[in-house]
Curated annotation (Swiss-Prot):
Pfam families: FA_synthesis (PF02504)
Gene from which the chain derives: plsX
Domain of life: Bacteria
Keyword ATP-binding: no
Family affiliation: Belongs to the PlsX family.
PANTHER family xref list: FATTY ACID/PHOSPHOLIPID SYNTHESIS PROTEIN PLSX, PHOSPHATE ACYLTRANSFERASE
Gene Ontology biological-process annotations: fatty acid biosynthetic process; phospholipid biosynthetic process
Localisation: Cytoplasm
Listed name of the protein: Phosphate acyltransferase
Organism lineage: Bacteria, Bacillati, Bacillota, Bacilli, Bacillales
This protein's GO CC annotations: cytoplasm
Keyword RNA-binding: no
Coiled coil feature spans: none
Organism this protein belongs to: Anoxybacillus flavithermus (strain DSM 21510 / WK1)
Length: 329
């Protein structure tokens, strides 16, 4: 199995990307990795090139580039060449921590959509109090959606949760303003009915305040609402940890308490760390495409590789195809 990685994408590229890739190769004996980027910058961080190859290019899609234009005009950009490796059959999956919009464009225009999927969805796995996490989609691949699009999100999310996360009959929830069946706008009401009419393990409407309680294994919504929910969760987590740090360093007594609680605090931090869950999968494409967080370190890249590998090994794409075909019948 070969995985292509954009070595130049992200805040800490190429160093953390290369280190994370090597860590994955050492851990998983059945993978090969192709790093795409400036070989002069990549090579100093390689300590073992076994099952590791480089495609050299000096062109990069920047965070400030307009996504679609960049993908179409920068034909030699590391992200574009990475996507080409997948579309031309030389790699089974790809990963980038670079420009999110550009990666979605590359996935759509180069890797291509699965037949029957109207719109891809961006789906991160977020932490929950019990440590199991949940998949949220869409978080911004498409800000608008129709009920049938969100139904497809539910099918794709269920396939991923079952095949990759090992959850038998994952619970599917629809993000809404209340838990009652008839709550929400027309989009929510029509989507509710569509999902309810399938064989999915649909638990109904779920509220944003209950997401981190683990109320569902997969939560679906339109991209606008999902992105707002994601950013709210991220911002709240940052604020809480900041307030906690301030309170525990305010005086000598609190500093002593912090020292005593250090193991528990580190455990909490690890439980809430996005890196433990890999990246956000771009569902609906013909091959696994993973968007790693822009600030990903080597640890996060390792888990993104693990995630991509599991999607390939468990044939998630084929499961999605079958699910969509059954709904279309």
């Amino acid at each position: 199995m070969k995985i292509a990685i954009d070595a130049m994408g992200g805040d800490h590229a190429p160093k953390e990307i290369v280190i994370g890739a090597q860590k994955a190769i050492e851990h998983f004996q059945d993978i090969e990795i192709t790093l795409v980027g400036n070989e002069t910058l990549i090579r100093p961080y390689i300590t073992n090139d076994e099952r590791l190859s480089i495609i050299h290019t000096e062109q990069v899609i920047e965070a400030t580039d307009e996504p679609v234009r960049a993908v179409r005009r920068k034909k030699e950009a590391s992200m574009v060449l990475m996507a080409n490796e997948v579309s031309e059959g030389r790699a089974h999956a790809c990963i980038s921590a670079g420009n999110t919009g550009a990666l979605m464009a590359a996935g759509l225009f180069i890797v291509g959509r699965i037949d029957g999927i109207d719109r891809p969805a961006l789906a991160p796995t977020l932490p929950t109090i019990d440590g199991k996490g949940f998949v949220l989609l869409d978080v911004g691949a498409n800000v608008d959606a129709r009920p049938e699009h969100i139904l497809q999100y539910a099918l794709m999310g269920a396939a991923y949760a079952e095949k990759v996360r090992g959850i038998h009959r994952p619970r599917i929830g629809l993000l809404n303003v209340g838990t009652e069946d008839q709550k929400g706008n027309e989009l929510a009401k029509k989507t509710f009915q569509l999902i309810q009419d399938t064989s999915l393990n649909f638990v109904g409407n779920v509220e944003a305040r209950d997401l981190l309680e683990g109320v569902a294994d997969v939560v679906v919504t339109d991209g606008f609402t999902g992105n707002v929910a994601l950013k709210t969760i991220e911002g709240t987590a940052i604020a809480v940890f900041s307030m906690l740090k301030s309170a525990l360093t305010s005086n000598v007594v609190s500093k002593m308490a912090a020292l005593a609680l250090k193991p528990q605090l580190m455990q909490l931090k690890k439980k809430m760390d996005y890196a433990e869950y890999g990246g956000a999968a771009l569902f609906g494409l013909r091959a696994p495409v993973i968007k790693a967080h822009g600030s990903s370190d080597a640890h996060a890249i390792f888990h993104a590789v693990r995630q991509a590998r599991e999607m390939v090994v468990n044939d998630v794409i084929q499961t999605v195809k079958q699910s969509i075909a059954e709904i279309k019948q």
